[in-house]
């Protein structure tokens, strides 16, 4: 059974159509260089074919752009605009719309997206389809791109005033923009004259000797250098009232308010008044000031206080941002000084917690608080940096000494409510000074030295157990073996430490407590160590406020069991003297004269194993030492310096 003729004809027609279509978009070529720039070259054996790329139409040798936007079925832009491009197309939206992933356009809300609207700061942005509007607030004028205020449209305390070179009207605080009237003749005590304030218009502040605020009572005629003096018929406002309206009256012909005009008054945070004045209704009329009013009534206000006016009187009041609701929010200041510890609390914050009459004390109630001021008002309390006073407790480890105490707060001397307790402490790294203060009975020596003039310097000298110089020997005497080392430290306390340094000029040992004993063993002489004794090491001398040396323990030849140490010290002015010794090479040793008024003494030190009692030898020193320990925690030497 053969294929019907009708089907054969149909197949031939379709095949012919595809062949023609293919031939219309591609062409055989001899080489690829014959293909158009927007065509693709394919090589199949010996056949080279040029075919136009997608988005182009032609025979491959010549290809032209196909306009997909010309017919709706060749692009998929729905409610967006189709824009033809070489070989393709794109969908575009009008201004105010945004293209979605589905290639449709949606409205842009310029009012909700930052940076898209240009409305004035006071205007309200209103979104519309494809656009937006700017609307000025009620009482303001303008196109929304710029809004100007009008009288009565500003918030309380502000006024509609011109600003900038173009004089556009904006709401401003008149306390920051006013003119000054300084004429002394405005005083109600000034006599006759014929001044007239016809040219006044705007906000003004009165300053100078004539007074700083308007008179509040009727002023006699022919005063204030004018015929009919003008006065404020009413009281001045308080700071919380903002801008108030008052009547200014002019006294003439036995009528205290013969003429009147309305003015505005405001109490400003800086402790002064400003007045929105208008020209008087007649001439000669002028505004008068009260000479009893004074400037600077708020100069004592601190940074955490506002200057406010109550019934025409200025006073300082804590700012609202000082208010707290919990003790944990208290701002404190802890100062860990060399001799004292001070704890301070902000007074305004205490008042916001209800402490109007603060009663502050420490573990020892005899140590109570006091008021002090700098930029702020504080309630402070001080305790010596020592164990015991004010109930202060000392804790000590190998590296630090820590003093702690408890601060108690009450609202009065008698207590019915819960009192507040605040623990505080200061930690000090152990050095020679701190270690002496934290020792119960360090081996020290004391001597007062005066260098004519004024200025007191204290020098201490102590014997330590190790090269760290943080553990002083305790007690009135020390027993050591000849293998042990003596670590001696001297330190300058107080005075101008940036200028003066401590120099040990002569340090020596004697077998008796007499520093002038002819039997002397010099450890340091003429500021330099004894070179024959290799155990001597000067750690520091003439470089800072402290000086240190060490030497191995020894005994004197003969029937001597005790050793006493003596050091002559000197305060060297580093700004004008060479203080650090130069000890290299052979040096002449004088040591003939030692100023005993500059000598500190330590001892006795006895050799371990000696059974002889040293109590008698130390008794006189112990009695003297016990007296000094009540005054100083270490050996002291006082310098009086000009």
UniProtKB/Swiss-Prot annotation:
It holds the Pfam family D8C_UMOD. GO terms for biological process: antibacterial innate immune response; apoptotic process; apoptotic signaling pathway; autophagy; calcium ion homeostasis; cellular response to stress; cellular response to unfolded protein; chaperone-mediated protein folding. Detected in urine (secreted form). Detected in kidney thick ascending limb epithelial cells (at protein level). The keyword Ribosomal protein does not apply. Residues 455-465 are annotated as: Internal hydrophobic patch (IHP). Residues 149-172 are annotated as: Beta hairpin. Residues 1-24 form the signal peptide. Residues 28-64, 65-106, 107-148, 293-324 form the EGF-like domain. Residues 431-454 are annotated as: Flexible ZP-N/ZP-C linker. It comes from the Eukaryota. GO terms for cellular component: apical plasma membrane; basolateral plasma membrane; ciliary membrane; cilium; endoplasmic reticulum; extracellular space; membrane; plasma membrane. GO terms for molecular function: calcium ion binding; IgG binding. Residues 173-292 are annotated as: D10C. Residues 599-607 are annotated as: External hydrophobic patch (EHP). Residues 587-590 are annotated as: Essential for cleavage by HPN. The ZP domain mediates polymerization, leading to the formation of long filaments. The core of the filament consists of interlocked ZP domains which assemble into a helical structure. Each ZP domain consists of an N-terminal (ZP-N) and C-terminal (ZP-C) region connected by a flexible linker; the linker allows the ZP domain to wrap around the ZP-C subdomain of the preceding subunit. The heavily glycosylated N-terminal part of the protein (containing several EGF-like domains) forms branches which protrude from the core and are be involved in pathogen capture. This is Uromodulin. The gene is Umod.
């Amino acid at each position: 059974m053969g294929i019907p003729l009708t089907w054969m004809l149909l197949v031939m027609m379709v095949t012919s159509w595809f062949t023609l279509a293919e031939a219309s978009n591609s062409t055989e070529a001899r080489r690829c260089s014959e293909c158009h720039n927007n065509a693709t070259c394919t090589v199949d054996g010996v056949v080279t074919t040029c075919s136009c790329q997608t988005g182009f139409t032609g025979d491959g040798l010549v290809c032209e752009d196909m306009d997909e936007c010309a017919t709706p079925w060749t692009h998929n832009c729905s409610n967006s605009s189709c824009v033809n491009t070489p070989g393709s197309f794109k969908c575009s939206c009008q201004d105010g719309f945004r293209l979605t992933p589905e290639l449709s356009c949606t409205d842009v809300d310029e009012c909700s997206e930052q940076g898209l609207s240009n409305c004035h700061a006071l205007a309200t942005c209103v979104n519309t389809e494809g656009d937006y509007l700017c609307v000025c607030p009620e009482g303001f004028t303008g196109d929304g791109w710029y809004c100007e205020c009008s009288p009565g449209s500003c918030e309380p305390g502000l006024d509609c005033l011109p600003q900038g070179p173009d004089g556009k009207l904006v709401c401003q605080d008149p306390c920051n923009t006013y003119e000054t009237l300084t004429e002394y003749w405005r005083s109600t005590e000034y006599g006759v004259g014929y001044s007239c304030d016809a040219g006044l218009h705007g906000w003004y502040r009165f300053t100078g000797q004539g007074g700083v605020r308007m008179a509040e009572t009727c002023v006699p005629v022919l005063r204030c250098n004018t015929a009919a003096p003008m006065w404020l018929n009413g009281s001045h406002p308080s700071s919380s009232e903002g801008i108030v309206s008052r009547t200014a009256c002019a006294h003439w012909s036995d009528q205290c308010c013969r003429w009147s005009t309305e003015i505005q008054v405001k109490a400003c945070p800086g402790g002064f008044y400003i007045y929105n004045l208008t020209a008087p209704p007649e001439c000669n009329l002028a505004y008068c000031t009260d000479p009893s009013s004074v400037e600077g009534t708020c100069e004592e206000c601190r940074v955490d206080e506002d200057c406010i006016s109550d019934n025409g009187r200025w006073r300082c009041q804590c700012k609202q941002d000082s208010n707290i609701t919990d003790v944990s929010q208290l701002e404190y200041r802890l100062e860990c000084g060399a001799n004292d510890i001070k704890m301070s609390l902000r007074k305004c914050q205490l008042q916001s917690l209800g402490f109007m009459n603060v009663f502050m004390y420490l573990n020892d109630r005899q140590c109570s608080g006091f008021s002090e001021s700098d930029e702020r008002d504080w309630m402070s309390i001080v305790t010596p940096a020592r164990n015991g006073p004010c109930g202060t407790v000392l804790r000590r480890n190998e590296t630090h000494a820590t003093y702690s105490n408890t601060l108690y707060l009450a609202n009065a001397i008698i207590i019915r409510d819960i009192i507040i307790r605040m623990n505080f402490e200061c930690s000090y790294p152990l050095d020679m000074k701190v270690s002496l203060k934290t020792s119960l009975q360090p081996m020290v020596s004391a001597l007062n030295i005066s260098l004519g003039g004024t200025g007191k310097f204290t020098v201490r000298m102590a014997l330590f157990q190790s090269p760290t110089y943080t553990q002083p020997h305790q007690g009135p005497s020390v027993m050591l073996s000849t293998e042990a080392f003596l670590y001696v430290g001297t330190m300058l306390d107080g005075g101008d430490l940036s200028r003066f340094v401590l120099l040990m000029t002569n340090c020596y040992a004697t077998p008796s407590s007499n520093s002038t004993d002819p039997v002397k063993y010099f450890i340091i002489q003429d500021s330099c160590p004894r070179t024959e004794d290799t155990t001597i090491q000067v750690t520091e001398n003439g470089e800072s406020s402290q000086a240190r040396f060490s030497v191995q323990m020894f005994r004197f030849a003969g029937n001597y069991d005790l050793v006493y140490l003596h050091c002559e010290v000197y305060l060297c002015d580093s700004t004008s003297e060479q203080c650090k010794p130069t000890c290299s090479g052979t040096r002449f040793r004088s040591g003939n004269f030692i100023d005993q008024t500059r000598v500190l003494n330590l001892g006795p030190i006895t050799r371990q194993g000696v059974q002889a009692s040293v109590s008698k030898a130390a008794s006189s020193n112990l009695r003297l030492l016990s007296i000094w320990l009540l005054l100083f925690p270490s050996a002291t030497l006082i310098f009086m310096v000009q």
